[in-house]
Amino acid sequence: MHTLLLLAALSNQITFITTQQGDIYTVIPQVILSEPCVCQVQILSVRNGTWGQSHTQQKQTLSLPANQPIELSRLSVNISSEDSVKIILTVSNGQSLHLSQQWPSSAR
């Protein structure tokens, strides 16, 4: 049992903290790494709606510490019922570490 807990604690993970007020969603991508990393962080958001499609991309290199949740950004998005929005977060050190996660995890 303790081995399973230790393995879970050591794994790298990306999560999204999300709050909603009406059509406004606030999305905070968060990463926890098992080892410190100088990583390339990319956030891509894609919106399809009645007014067409838009893409926004942010890239930066960050020094990320180990074993603590790090909030990488804060995005506020107005999503109506006609819109489809996805946010993809990628964290990579260009070698052995490559994490990618999409929000929402299933299609809206």
From Swiss-Prot:
Signal peptide location: 1-8
Any single GO CC term annotated in Swiss-Prot or TrEMBL for this entry: periplasmic space
InterPro entries attached to this UniProt entry: Curli_assembly_CsgC/AgfC, Curli_production_prot_CsgC
Phosphoprotein keyword on record: no
Keywords, comma-separated and alphabetical: Chaperone, Periplasm, Signal
Keyword ATP-binding: no
Localization per record: Periplasm
Domain of life: Bacteria
Protein function: Plays a role in the extracellular assembly of CsgA into thin aggregative fimbriae (Tafi) fibers. Assembly may also require CsgE. Tafi are thought to be assembled via an extracellular nucleation-precipitation (ENP) pathway, and possibly also via an intracellular non-CsgC-dependent pathway.
Family: Belongs to the CsgC/AgfC family.
NCBIfam families recorded: PRK10102.1 (NF007507)
Name of the protein this chain belongs to: Curli assembly protein CsgC
Species, as recorded: Salmonella arizonae (strain ATCC BAA-731 / CDC346-86 / RSK2980)
